[in-house]
């Protein structure tokens, strides 16, 4: 009986170690891929062959790696292009808002989210992000109004419904 328990323990422990090693290898590969992609895009930018999409991809990678200030620089470079359409501008401003909120620069995040909504008034994600910032700043009335606006554009939005009921219950 002791041999069985010992064998079971060894097998179980080995499986846990293998799972951890597998997870670590995947994370290293993912990080390595992102680093190689950053190098490729930087080289392309340095050679002045980069497009707005390349800057956007680079900024998105920086966000994944939580390098927010570098991502912000790349998005601001994209904004220098005067040929962007409204949807591109809205996406960039929404991303800038996300970057600022991740750095707890809530006032600047609010400005960027409002700019995104200026270009696309029914941009649901920007409205939800803006409502979330209002919640973080304890501006309950503004958050409620923003979630209600989300429901005007998307009446079936479950996140907005849930958040709205939570905030309303907190106020009561």
UniProtKB/Swiss-Prot annotation:
SUPFAM superfamilies reported in the protein's UniProt record: TPR-like
Pfam families per record: TPR_12
Subcellular location: Plastid, Cyanelle
Keyword Ribosomal protein: no
Cystine pairs: none
Keyword line: Cyanelle, Plastid, Repeat, TPR repeat
GO cellular component, as recorded: cyanelle
TPR repeat copies, ranges: 52-85, 90-123, 124-157
Superkingdom to which the source organism belongs: Eukaryota
Family statement drawn from the similarity comment of this UniProt entry: Belongs to the ycf37 family.
The protein's name in its UniProt record: Uncharacterized protein ycf37
């Amino acid at each position: 009986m002791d041999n069985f328990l010992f064998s079971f323990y060894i097998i179980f422990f080995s499986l846990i170690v293998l799972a951890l090693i597998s997870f670590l290898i995947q994370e290293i590969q993912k990080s390595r891929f992102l680093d190689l992609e950053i190098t490729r895009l930087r080289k392309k930018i340095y050679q002045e062959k980069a497009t707005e999409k390349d800057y956007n991809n680079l900024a998105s990678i920086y966000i994944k790696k939580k390098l927010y200030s570098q991502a912000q620089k790349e998005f601001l470079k994209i904004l220098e292009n005067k040929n962007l359409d409204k949807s591109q501008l809205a996406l960039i401003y929404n991303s800038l808002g996300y970057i600022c909120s991740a750095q707890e620069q809530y006032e600047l995040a609010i400005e960027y989210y409002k700019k995104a909504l200026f270009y696309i008034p029914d941009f649901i994600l920007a409205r939800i992000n803006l409502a979330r910032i209002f919640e973080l700043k304890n501006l309950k009335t503004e958050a409620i109004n923003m979630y209600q606006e989300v429901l005007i554009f998307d009446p079936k939005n479950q996140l907005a419904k849930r958040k709205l009921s939570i905030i309303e219950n907190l106020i009561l």
